C-alpha cells in the first residue's frame, strides 16, 4: 500500500505543532524586515513584522570591537548589536573634549572684576545691595526722587489749605508744629502730639519695628513708633502708630503710603484719632 501524500503546508504545520516557527529576516534596499511569531492574549498564533531602517556610520574601532563582544545569559544566542527584546537604546550623548589650553584661553577672555568693588547695585533705590533685598521693593517708595516730590507737594498743599481758609491756626500747627523749639517733642501734651500722628493699618504679621522705621524714615523725622503686637505670639496685629515731628511730614506720609503696596498688602494710612 502506497503511503498517502500530504501537501507541503501540512508538513510545515506538523513541524511546528508544539512550538512557534523561527523568526525570519530579509532586507530590501535600506530597510530590514524581521518577522516573528507569538501567541496573543486569546491564545492565537499571530505574526509580527518589524521594520528597521539601515543607516551606515563611521565609528571608532573600539566601538566596533565592543559591538562584537560575545554575549552571555539569555542573550547568548543573539546576533551582534543590540536586541530589541532585551536592550533599549536611549538617546545618544555627544561628548566634547576640551584641552586645558582652550580652557585657559576662554577664562582669559572673560571680563575681570576689580577686587574690592561692590558689584551689587539695587535698581530700585540705587543702593549697594541686590534688588531682592531692597526694603522698598513693591512699594511706592521705589524712587527717592518720587518720594521727595510727593512729600514736598503734600506739605505745600497742607500750608496752602490753611492759608486759604483764613481761620485762626494755633501756634503748634504753624510750620509743622514748631512754634517753640522747632517741633513737637516727646514732652508735649498728648493732644498736641496726636496732631502729627498717623495710623498705618493692614500690615503683615511679620512686620517689625525695624521694618516700620525703614518704611517712614525717609519721609521725615519722627518722635515715636508703636507697633501693636499679640501678647501670646508676639506677632504684629496689623496696625501701627507713627508720631512725626512735623505735621507736614505726617501729611506727606498719608499722601505717599496710603493705598500703596508693601509686603504683598495694600497699606491704609490715615490720621490718628484722638484718644477719649
From Swiss-Prot:
One of its GO terms (cellular component) is eukaryotic 48S preinitiation complex. Pfam families: eIF3g (PF12353), RRM_1 (PF00076). Keywords: Cytoplasm, Initiation factor, Protein biosynthesis, RNA-binding. Its main location: cytoplasm. One of its GO terms (biological process) is formation of cytoplasmic translation initiation complex. Residues 196-274 form the RRM domain. SMART domains: RRM. Gene3D superfamilies: 3.30.70.330. It is found in: Cytoplasm. InterPro entries: eIF3_g, eIF3g_N, eIF3G_RRM, Nucleotide-bd_a/b_plait_sf, RBD_domain_sf, RRM_dom. Component of the eukaryotic translation initiation factor 3 (eIF-3) complex. The eIF-3 complex interacts with pix. Belongs to the eIF-3 subunit G family. RNA-binding component of the eukaryotic translation initiation factor 3 (eIF-3) complex, which is involved in protein synthesis of a specialized repertoire of mRNAs and, together with other initiation factors, stimulates binding of mRNA and methionyl-tRNAi to the 40S ribosome. The eIF-3 complex specifically targets and initiates translation of a subset of mRNAs involved in cell proliferation. This subunit can bind 18S rRNA. This is Eukaryotic translation initiation factor 3 subunit G-2. It comes from Drosophila persimilis.
Amino acid at each position: 500500500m502506497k503511503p498517502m501524500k500530504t501537501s507541503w503546508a501540512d508538513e510545515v504545520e506538523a513541524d511546528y505543532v508544539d512550538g512557534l516557527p523561527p523568526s525570519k529576516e530579509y532586507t530590501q534596499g535600506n530597510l530590514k524586515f524581521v518577522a516573528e511569531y507569538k501567541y496573543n492574549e486569546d491564545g492565537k498564533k499571530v505574526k509580527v513584522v518589524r521594520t528597521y531602517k539601515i543607516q551606515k556610520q563611521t565609528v571608532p574601532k573600539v566601538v566596533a570591537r565592543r559591538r562584537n563582544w560575545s554575549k552571555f545569559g539569555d542573550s547568548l544566542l543573539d546576533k551582534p548589536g543590540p536586541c530589541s527584546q532585551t536592550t533599549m537604546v536611549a538617546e545618544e550623548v555627544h561628548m566634547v573634549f576640551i584641552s586645558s589650553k582652550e580652557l585657559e584661553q576662554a577664562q582669559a577672555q572673560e571680563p575681570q572684576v576689580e577686587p574690592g568693588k561692590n558689584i551689587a547695585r539695587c535698581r530700585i533705590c540705587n543702593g549697594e545691595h541686590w534688588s531682592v533685598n531692597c526694603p522698598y521693593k513693591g512699594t511706592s517708595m521705589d524712587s527717592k526722587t518720587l518720594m521727595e516730590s510727593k512729600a514736598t507737594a503734600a506739605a505745600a498743599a497742607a500750608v496752602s489749605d490753611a492759608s486759604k481758609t483764613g481761620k485762626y491756626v494755633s501756634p503748634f500747627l504753624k510750620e509743622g508744629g514748631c512754634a517753640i523749639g522747632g517741633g513737637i517733642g516727646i514732652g508735649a501734651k498728648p493732644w498736641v502730639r496726636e496732631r502729627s500722628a498717623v495710623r498705618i493699618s493692614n500690615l503683615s504679621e511679620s512686620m517689625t519695628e525695624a521694618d516700620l522705621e525703614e518704611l517712614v524714615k525717609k519721609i521725615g523725622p519722627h518722635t515715636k513708633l508703636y507697633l501693636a503686637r499679640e501678647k501670646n505670639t508676639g506677632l504684629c496685629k496689623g496696625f501701627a502708630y507713627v508720631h512725626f515731628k512735623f505735621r507736614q511730614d505726617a501729611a506727606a506720609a498719608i499722601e505717599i503710603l496710603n493705598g500703596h503696596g508693601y509686603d504683598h498688602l495694600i497699606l491704609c494710612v490715615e490720621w490718628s484719632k484722638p484718644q477719649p
